Amino acid sequence: MSVRASSRLGLLAVAMLFAAAGARAQVPPPPTYPDKPPEGLKPNTNEDEPLSTEPKPGEVIQKRPGKGSEPLQFRPPPANPYQLPGPTRGAPREAPPVPDRWRIMQALGFKFPVYDPYNQNVLKGDLPLWNDPWLKEHLPWVAEKLKPDWFFSLTAISDSLVELRRLPTPVAPQTSVRPNSVDIFGQGKQQVFVETLIFEMAAIKGNTTFRPPDYEIRITPAIQYNRAEVDENRALRIDPRQGTERSDNHVGLQTAFVDVHLRNVSDRYDFDSIRVGIQPITSDFRGFLLNDVPMGIRYFGIRDNNHVQFNVGWFRKMEKDTNSGLNDPWTKMRKDETYLANYYQQDFPFVGFTSQGLAALNINREGTQGNYFNNNGFIERPAALGDERGRNYTVGYLGYTGDGHLRNFPGGFLDRWNLSTSVYIALGHEDHNSLAGQSQDIRAGFAAAEFSRDFSWMRLRLSALYQSGDKDPYDHKATGFDAIFENPLFAGADTSFWIRQSVPLIGGGGIALSARNGVLASLRTSKEQGQSNFVNPGLMLLGVGLDADVMPQLRLIGNFNYLRFQDTTVLGVLRNQKPPDREIGWDVSGAVQYRPFMNQNVVFNTSAAALYPGKGLKQLYDEDKRGPQYSILFNLLLTY
């Protein structure tokens, strides 16, 4: 090989070496991943590191008590954005357009009949009215007016009740059912059948998914038929010739109001609204002071993302039908007015607990209207005791109520307990008291509390109640507490004998120891049509209860309450005898609630309760000869 050829080969080798080096230099380096993920993604964590079991300050652990419900033990794997493919340009849209968000199911081919309560239905407020095919065909001008967001909601309820009970019942003074009935007390067995149909109709404007409605118009008529059978004449009607059976019916109006949304005060839809008409009002969490459906004007709203709620209102009592207890819109309203203001604060004084402050003024001016007799002929106002003169009164109530969890209670020893409590003082004046025969200053108090704790599927309840009583009816001071219109959810509520039944004070006037669906020993003629009475014996209640959700369809309820008067001087004066002992007795009750479809459409309730008399009740009713008073009921609720 010549020298020239060798030099050419050397130059070619050098050129190839430089080309390879240049190619190697142009290869991109491997990608490097940042130590910290982009903003918004979870940071890298050690999946094998156990989570801490100690809660952070103020943290609420979402864990049911007991075993078998442990929280996460390890952290889930972090999200890795490099394992998720991004969207590609020009990809077809997977969601087809629909007319509006209410018609999504119809756009996909689903059609539900109008009578189906379990799926989308125009009668349940699921769909706007204007686009209903029937309405657009037959009433197009109405459909046009209802654009774009008027809804209609219909609720129909059938409430059937059969009740068997035994109450103290007097022998009629004119004539008796059985010969030789010369005692004061007769046979007390009673049977009651009640059928109530309730139709609630509401027209609502607005998108209520995330904000309050702009307008709401609601009307709730109720139709009731009731039949009662007793063992003594004159127990059902004032005329003993009308016998021991009574059938009655009534059409009432339970709600009829207009609700107007006035304004939003924040971007979280805190609002102010006003409601005018016959409307439900509950003054506190448990209905101790006022739980009624009167005529009224209510201004209400929320603040601080629903952490603050308030109500300011004026209410006037509707006259009630005697035998049904429903509102009677066909008669004049009563001269009984209530001015109410309350304020709710969530997470006060600690997280998970809601506090409420309340002020109410009850003004009754029915003393100048003369005597009022109910539909059965018995006098209601004034009460048939003392000099039976009419009376007016003005009483103010100041109260505090609270309800919630005690998990964040200082000290931590109540972290599994719940508390519901109410405290009231009543201050006022009545111009005349029928028993004392003179004016009285009202100075009374009330307190109630219920502690509860959940043990998996069971809840234990401990209840205590105090109602001040009057020690001297003639000292110009009325110190027995009474409410405006109570309907308490407490100590078993309407499964308890003492709360459910009205026990008449026989031989002491046409009054009752306690009102039907009331816990206070108030000595009223009735809760629905009588006046408040602040000269009463007061009450102390101590109780224990248990709620057991055995299955989603089945709940068992049990209650055991001890009852005692605070002072029986008033009872001694009314009965013209030595004041009886203060012990009322033991109220024992049990109930079963069965929901076959695990919802409220079909609910069957049954309960049994008995009042085992104490020394005081035996002295009032001679209970040694007759055994305990009892109540057994069967109730079927059907809801559409």
Where would I find each of the regions flagged by the language model?
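Bacterial N-terminal signal peptides
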Residues: 10-20
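N-terminal periplasmic/intermembrane-space "pro-region" immediately following the signal or transit peptide
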Residues: 25-214, 220, 456, 460, ...
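Short loop/turn motifs that connect adjacent beta-strands in outer-membrane beta-barrel proteins
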Residues: 123-154, 165-169, 204-217, 262-272, ...
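Membrane-embedded beta-strand positions of outer-membrane beta-barrel proteins
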Residues: 154-160, 217-221, 274-276, 310-312, ...
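Outer membrane beta-barrel
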Residues: 196, 200-321, 345, 451-501, ...
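Signature for the C-terminal beta-barrel architecture of outer-membrane proteins
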Residues: 268-270, 279-478, 540-542, 550, ...
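C-terminal structural cap/anchor segments
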Residues: 464-467, 471-583
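Outer-membrane beta-barrel "beta-signal"
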Residues: 590, 626-640
